[in-house]
């Protein structure tokens, strides 16, 4: 399947929700990433804003994933780790999501982007300012012409309101607001991505504790079996003469090698506990981890969507796509900033020489100003070039996020398939080891 996304630097009025409404969006969300060009015109005598050339992005997506077909179990909206049905795991992940500093930082960045979006939309509403002033002045004219003229004094009081509004002729304000809102949506997707990543690290650490603890128990059983086998080997060598000293030494060496695994496993358990403590927002120490010594049953592999649909469930891919649209809107704002700006203003003031007469005289005014750049040293053109470079980088980042997502899924499926093959071999090895022990007795 080939998906072609065309990005232009002047965005249409499509909302962020139309592109990536939420995790689990339909497949048309990726196909809908194409942005239409927008030509803005003024009255006669003003030229239109040029539409930059579109960039084509082609990504070849497979029709299906290459490995494994899941059982008839859909991916639900509930937290994914609850499928293990283990209360201690649920508590561990909940503590991580409640105290992790990375996740707190992600929420802080979201609040920052929300505030930036509100600030970007402020120019769409007229601004109203109030002014109040009092002035006292003295004029000394005694040195003028040699005459002794008394000093003149005067007082002036004023009170007023001023209204200002910028007419968004070329869509600069709207484009800036759109870019900010899209960045806000992308930051919200970052929060979800951070939460998912942290939950994965927490589950991995918890499973490491359980698996290494269970393996320690298994090694303990192997040590007991090895000690029994060593006793049998020594007895055969000492009484029946059917063995050799070499057999005894080899069995002793194998037994000590098995015992040497216990400190390694204990160290891995400690490091996993430290990792879980740091993820929870605590200093690593002697924190107890409520974890069983037996691995929970694996839930069935869920049905996998086609790759193009599965990508819409990935918050990192969603965030990358939203940032492409945000960068596109920023290019539009930079282009619009190169054209004239129309400012409207109105003022209503009270003015008097005596404070008691402040409301006796009023001054009102209405003005319209057209401000446009003539010579700016190429600053605005450079800003357009910079925003276009940001857009190109965002597109490349979006492509990379898609490829990384596909690789992660394929890697996980490969590990699942090879893991099942290894389990079959280990089960056969277990059977042979049991027969070997019986024969040794």
What are these regions (language model features)?
Residues 10-16, 20, 25, 30-98, ...:
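Terminal intrinsically disordered/low-complexity segments used for targeting and assembly
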Residues 79, 85-87, 92, 99, ...:
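Small/polar-residue-enriched beta-strand and adjacent coil segments characteristic
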Residues 105-120, 194, 198-221, 228-230, 258-266, ...:
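Amphipathic alpha-helical coiled-coil segments
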Residues 240-241:
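Glycine-focused motif/segment detector
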